[in-house]
Amino acid sequence: MKKNFKPKAWVLPQPVLILGTYDADGTPNAMNAAWGGQWDYNKIFISLGSHATTDNLNRLGELTVAFATKDTMTEADYVGMVSGRKQPDKIERTGWKSERGENVNAPVFDCFPMTMECKVSEKLYESETGCYLIADIVNIICDEKYLAEDGKPDMEKMELITFDPIHNGYMTLGERVGDAFGSGKKLMV
């Protein structure tokens, strides 16, 4: 038997993305965003409400996008709960350290295994309450300790987390269970 539910924001899994920008005075800022994903091969999209981060993006047009992990979950949750407009020292409270990105004017926080440097290319459906942001990925930074034997990022090593919008929780992503564009070959005739 199956149960029906009214429409909800239950696309699963939802990433826990940490958006890094600089405030007008050069202070690093970050926010937690779950509504985002791949837009095209070298582009991402993020659904944003009105935040200090949105103001920073309107001013600078550049950001970093990091992937939260089991180890960064508490601080990642905090930067999603607290507004940079009301708590200007919120990054200091997390203990995160950052340096300016090599390819964008945005902070790269040292505690995340993988970070994308991005430049805003388009805003869709912009209103007083927010917008859909399309950004070009100009570089991807991965800490070498999270690389697989083939030299590419290893998701299993990262212990990435996903947002559970149904029960308001965070879950770690699981183990590899198959090969994309390979496991299904056994059903091909």
What do these predicted ranges mean?
Residues M1-V189:
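Basic, polyanion-binding surface patches
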